[in-house]
Amino acid sequence: MMFATKIKMKPGCHNSHSLLEIDEIYITGCATPGYYKKDIVHDHVKENPGSIQVNVWPYPDVVHAVSVNREKYVRSSPNAYGHDNLLSLPRE
């Protein structure tokens, strides 16, 4: 199983609470752990649903999404408070 363990936001957006501002996601449990651009992660989970989970309880799946401006991004199931667990990961 692969896990998203931390995120990098776009320059100037370190404190953003927008999934669209995520630039890269650190993935572990794969042959080459490291940071991957969000569009690469988007394509992977689109082709392989359920293959990456957020490393925050309750470990929701990372799923693909497309913004109204046709920008590829990823998200997870919101937690009980309506907050996406992907945004709870440590930031660099």
Predicted segments, located by residue:
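Ser/Thr- (and often Asn-) enriched beta-sheet segments in non-cytosolic proteins
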Residues: 6-8, 26, 53
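A broad, low-specificity signal marking well-ordered, structured residues that form hydrophobic/aromatic
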Residues: 2, 20, 72
